[in-house]
């Protein structure tokens, strides 16, 4: 995981001299100028590939096979030759797919028909720059580079500018769905040059996941918008996973439910408004037995959660844009705290010695399990609405800052299939933004407002019960606090502003008069109450 936001001012990826190669007639019977020892193809070397892909780790390999299976001849390349061989073997075993493997950047680039479109799926940061540099010398004006990794959006904007200075087109394309999605249909979020998208949209629309209202791909917008949207998608994913883990924690430790019962419950929830990929896989996880010891495998997994940085970037961007995203921030904080395993174990011992008592056992005896299960279902759904609202508000704020003109309803649509956060209620989010493209928040959409109001009593019961039992539910608590804060016409922020004016002369506005005001608070306090003056001295 990168601990800092990547710099957007690193050297150009096109530092090697750009070479404009003479046009080659790829449609002629003359073989491409590479040796047979450096290229192997499952289809005739006389035909040029329609697209290329570099980076044959799990995601790249599966996406390449997906493209080939959809009928688009593809060239692949990887610095490690064994990965090329492995991909060729898979292409043959999975149906003699039209995929050709190449072992040098030159042979790889020249095997693709013009204007070339090359997808890069390597580790974000400098490896992307290095990969582009190795390819760019053999590319020509009008060719396109497509970065499909989880890249910091400003790096994409820098590379896009570098590409333009050399006549190339550039896309930063978020790819979501994991290895299965890449192989059978991911959600794709391409942003950058529209011409680059237009050149390959016929391929992307076939490769992407398919839902009732079309393929899960759309042109996101200019610049680094595609990577930014994928980043926020991942931030929402952090929130989703945290909320589900809290539902599990309450049901297991307050409700006393077994893994078998939890598997059944999540299966049932996956037939409700909670139907989603993450709920589905959670049900599966509870059903898996440990093959090395007794009991369920999930109980043997160390309670430390990893991360790669996109959640952190999301929270940083929310702070920079003054967008409240407490549910996503809470999920990030929980990942940090999960990493403090030894500290947490030590804290548990010290606090127990100091007299800390676990209340969960006493509370468990009086719990109505059936009601608890239904309450947790409602609390989870209401909390999810708040988490998605925060992510959408962040996208709207960034779109306004950058002039991207993001279509939030369309983003919800392409997340309905293929991606990790795919869920049935994304269709409701799509419809909310179709009803009102300028919707201030999902919380105030008429349909979602009804859902929230109907579920708030159950939501409060779950959070209150968890607090009483000493079970932390930071995501649900943050979501409920967000809801309660957002719906209040007047907050205690007036006192905070008075304090700021008291110690820093930051001024304040009044509710009854226009303008800004400053008050000599300590002086007036002494005048109004002699006891205050005495206390201050």
Curated annotation (Swiss-Prot):
An example Pfam family from this entry, by short name, is 6PGD
Where are the bilayer-spanning segments? none
Any idea which GO molecular function terms this record carries? NADP binding; phosphogluconate 2-dehydrogenase activity; phosphogluconate dehydrogenase (decarboxylating) activity
Give the EC number.
Answer: 1.1.1.44
What keywords sit in the KW lines?
Chloroplast, Gluconate utilization, NADP, Oxidoreductase, Pentose shunt, Plastid, Transit peptide
* UniProt binding sites for substrate: 150, 176-178, 233-234, 238, 308, 335, 500, 506
Q: Note whether S-adenosyl-L-methionine occurs among the keywords.
A: no
Q: Where is the transit peptide?
A: 1-44
Please name the GO terms of the biological process aspect recorded for this protein, alphabetically: D-gluconate metabolic process; pentose-phosphate shunt, oxidative branch
InterPro entries xref list: 6-PGluconate_DH-like_C_sf (IPR008927), 6PGD_dom2 (IPR013328), 6PGDH_C (IPR006114), 6PGDH_Gnd/GntZ (IPR006113), 6PGDH_NADP-bd (IPR006115), NAD(P)-bd_dom_sf (IPR036291), Pgluconate_DH (IPR006183)
| Residues annotated to bind NADP(+) | 55-60, 78-80, 122-124, 150
Can you tell which superkingdom this protein's organism belongs to?
A: Eukaryota
Single GO cellular component annotation?
chloroplast
Q: Which reaction does it catalyse?
A: 6-phospho-D-gluconate + NADP(+) = D-ribulose 5-phosphate + CO2 + NADPH
Pathway recorded for this protein: Carbohydrate degradation; pentose phosphate pathway; D-ribulose 5-phosphate from D-glucose 6-phosphate (oxidative stage): step 3/3
Catalytic residues identified in the record: 230, 237
User: Where is this chain's protein located in or outside the cell?
Assistant: Plastid, Chloroplast
What functional role does this protein have? Answer: Catalyzes the oxidative decarboxylation of 6-phosphogluconate to ribulose 5-phosphate and CO(2), with concomitant reduction of NADP to NADPH.
Protein family membership = Belongs to the 6-phosphogluconate dehydrogenase family.
Give the multimer and partner information. Homodimer.
Know the name of this protein? 6-phosphogluconate dehydrogenase, decarboxylating 2, chloroplastic
């Amino acid at each position: 995981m990168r601990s800092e936001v990547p710099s957007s001012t690193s050297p150009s990826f096109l530092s090697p001299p750009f070479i404009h190669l003479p046009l080659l007639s790829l449609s002629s019977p003359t073989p491409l100028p590479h040796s047979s020892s450096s290229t192997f193809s499952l289809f005739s070397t006389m035909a040029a590939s329609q697209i290329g892909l570099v980076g044959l780790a799990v995601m790249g390999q599966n996406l390449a096979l997906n493209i080939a299976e959809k009928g688009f001849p593809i060239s692949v390349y990887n610095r490690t030759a064994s990965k090329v061989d492995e991909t060729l073997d898979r292409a043959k075993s999975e149906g003699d797919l039209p995929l050709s493997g190449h072992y040098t950047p030159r042979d790889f680039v020249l095997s693709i028909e013009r204007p070339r479109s090359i997808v890069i799926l390597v580790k974000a940061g400098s490896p992307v720059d290095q990969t582009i540099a190795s390819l760019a010398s053999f590319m020509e004006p009008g060719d396109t580079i497509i970065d499909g990794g989880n890249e910091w959006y400003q790096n994409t904007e820098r590379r896009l500018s570098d590409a333009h200075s050399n006549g190339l087109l550039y896309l930063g394309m978020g790819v979501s769905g994991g290895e299965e999605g890449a192989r059978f249909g991911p959600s794709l979020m391409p942003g950058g040059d529209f011409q680059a998208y237009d050149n390959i949209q016929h391929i992307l629309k076939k490769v992407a996941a398919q839902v009732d209202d079309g393929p899960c791909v759309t042109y996101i917008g200019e610049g680094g918008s595609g990577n930014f949207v994928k980043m926020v998608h991942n931030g929402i994913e952090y929130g989703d996973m945290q909320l589900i883990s809290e539902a599990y924690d309450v049901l297991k430790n307050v409700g006393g439910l077994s893994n078998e019962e939890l598997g059944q419950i999540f299966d049932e929830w996956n037939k409700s408004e909670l139907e989603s990929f993450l709920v589905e896989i959670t049900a599966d996880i509870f059903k898996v037995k440990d093959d090395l010891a007794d009991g369920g495998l999930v109980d043997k997994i160390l309670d430390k959660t990893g991360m790669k940085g996109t959640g952190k970037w999301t929270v940083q961007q929310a702070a920079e844009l003054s967008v409240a995203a407490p549910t996503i921030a809470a999920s990030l904080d929980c990942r940090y705290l999960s990493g403090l395993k030894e500290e947490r174990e030590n804290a548990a011992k010290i606090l127990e010695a100091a007299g800390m008592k676990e209340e969960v056992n006493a509370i468990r005896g009086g719990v109505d399990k059936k009601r608890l299960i239904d309450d947790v279902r409602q609390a989870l759904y209401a909390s999810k609405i708040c988490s998605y609202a925060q992510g959408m508000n962040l996208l709207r704020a960034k779109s306004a800052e950058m002039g991207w003109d993001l279509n939030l309803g369309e983003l919800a649509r392409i997340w309905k299939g293929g991606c990790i956060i795919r869920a049935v209620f994304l269709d409701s989010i799509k419809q909310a933004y179709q009803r009102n493209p300028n919707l201030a928040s999902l919380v105030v959409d008429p349909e979602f407002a009804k859902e929230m109001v109907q579920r708030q009593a159950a939501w409060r019961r779950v959070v209150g019960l968890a607090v009483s039992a000493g079970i932390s539910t930071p995501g649900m608590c943050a979501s409920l606090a967000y809801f309660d804060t957002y719906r209040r016409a007047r907050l205690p922020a007036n006192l905070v502003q008075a304090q700021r004016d008291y110690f820093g002369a930051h001024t304040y506005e009044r509710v009854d008069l226009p303008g800004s005001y400053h008050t000599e608070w300590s002086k007036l306090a002494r005048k109004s109450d002699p006891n205050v003056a005495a206390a201050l001295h």
